[in-house]
Amino acid sequence: TIYIAKDYEQNLREIEHQHQLSEDPSIYVQNASVTDDTLAPRGKSTLYVLAPVTHQHPNVDWKRERSAFRDRVIRQMAKAGFPDVESRIEYERVVTPDDWDGKYEVFRGATFNLAHNLRQMLHLRPRNRFEDIDGVYLVGGGTHPGSGLPVIYESARISSRLLMQDLGVSIPASYSSDFFRDETQIRIHHQRRPCSATAVT
């Protein structure tokens, strides 16, 4: 479920340009236990709620704002068709840009990494292999093809294929995860150059 702020363009300006928390934030709510009943006990749900906010910025003190913004998101959930959520919460975890930066080393807590616009999406993101420096590879949400966990996995697959090609590793055109469990199938013919990898989340 997506709840879009009444003034969506203003909401985007607050995130991208003004670097402030919106009084009317857009939110995304997912209940994964609807399709996977192993995620919660019978009759209960797991809710994932995303409220896009600015990256770490002096305008937002998350130590001071965390609780109030969390309450604001709960109120937005009622507008999106989820009334009385507060009284039914048994466990919750609030993750802010400070947490993404401090605990998970996501630069400035920006989970979408580069600007999330058409000029910095898909093939317009930095490539997975440096063109100017031999043996340097990038992987993560800041590289091609973009952010979001499934897409970051694809970035890892692209970068690992490029690395293996450069190392002269023979791999089938299409392979499963079982391929890597049997190390005898991996044959390194030669190493063309030293390699390094950098995670860019």
Task: Show where each model-derived region lies.
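Short glycine/proline-enriched loop/turn "hinge" motifs that connect secondary-structure elements
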Residues: 37-44, 127-132
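Mid-domain catalytic core of redox enzymes
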Residues: 1-40, 179-184
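Generic recognition of stable, solvent-exposed alpha-helical segments in well-folded globular domains
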Residues: 24, 64, 68-72, 106, ...
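A conserved FAD-binding loop/helix module that cradles the flavin
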Residues: 141-164
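A glycine-rich dinucleotide-binding beta-alpha-beta segment and adjacent secondary-structure elements
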Residues: 22-30, 75, 79, 83-145
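Active-site-proximal substrate-binding core of FAD-dependent oxidoreductases
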Residues: 164-199
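Conserved FAD/dinucleotide-binding core of flavoprotein oxidoreductases
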Residues: 41-76
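Flexible loop/turn segments at secondary-structure boundaries
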Residues: 35-38, 55-58, 97-98, 144-147
